[in-house]
Swiss-Prot record:
Alphabetic keyword roster: Cell inner membrane, Cell membrane, Membrane, NAD, Quinone, Translocase, Transmembrane, Transmembrane helix, Transport, Ubiquinone
Biological role stated in the UniProt entry: NDH-1 shuttles electrons from NADH, via FMN and iron-sulfur (Fe-S) centers, to quinones in the respiratory chain. The immediate electron acceptor for the enzyme in this species is believed to be ubiquinone. Couples the redox reaction to proton translocation (for every two electrons transferred, four hydrogen ions are translocated across the cytoplasmic membrane), and thus conserves the redox energy in a proton gradient.
Species of provenance: Psychrobacter sp. (strain PRwf-1)
A Pfam family: Oxidored_q2
Family: Belongs to the complex I subunit 4L family.
Catalytic activity: a quinone + NADH + 5 H(+)(in) = a quinol + NAD(+) + 4 H(+)(out)
Domain of life, source organism: Bacteria
Annotated EC: 7.1.1.-
Protein location: Cell inner membrane
Gene Ontology CC terms, in alphabetical order: NADH dehydrogenase complex; plasma membrane
Disulfide pattern: none
Encoding gene, per UniProt annotation: nuoK
Name this polypeptide is given: NADH-quinone oxidoreductase subunit K
Single GO MF descriptor: NADH:ubiquinone reductase (non-electrogenic) activity
Length: 124
């Protein structure tokens, strides 16, 4: 009795089994420079814009840049601390956004506009 060999299908490499050293890791300096640029863009938005909504959006950009810096540092030192700090920053950003939007709605309801300069005229 003659047995025929079983044909095997050759496995093709997937993303999970591909060589991770093809592109190499992103240097920590590049990630921190990107975070600093994003933070500076947010800071310029806070300093230049007088609309309350745009100021809130700029604050969110700044908090995202801080989170990116923690993620980059954590991945550089192979530590989960950066990811944990990012979760804290994300939670803080959500609380800041909800409180900021509540203040924004009340401000718009009372004033009819979102100009921050007129907030100095508010009375207690």
């Amino acid at each position: 009795m003659h047995l025929k060999p079983v044909e095997t299908v050759q496995d093709t490499p997937t993303f999970a089994t591909a060589d991770p050293t093809i592109l190499g890791p992103i240097p920590m300096e590049h990630g921190l420079i990107l975070a600093a640029i994003i933070f500076a863009i947010g800071l310029c938005g806070v300093m230049v814009r007088r609309n309350f909504l745009f100021m809130l959006m700029s604050l969110e950009i700044m908090m995202s840049a801080a989170g990116l810096a923690f993620i980059v540092a954590g991945s550089h030192w192979l530590s989960a601390d950066g990811q944990i700090m990012f979760i804290f920053i994300l939670t803080l950003a959500a609380a800041e956004a909800s409180l900021g939007l509540a203040i924004l709605l009340q401000f718009y309801h009372r004033r009819g506009h979102l100009d921050v300069d007129s907030a100095n005229e508010m009375r207690g």
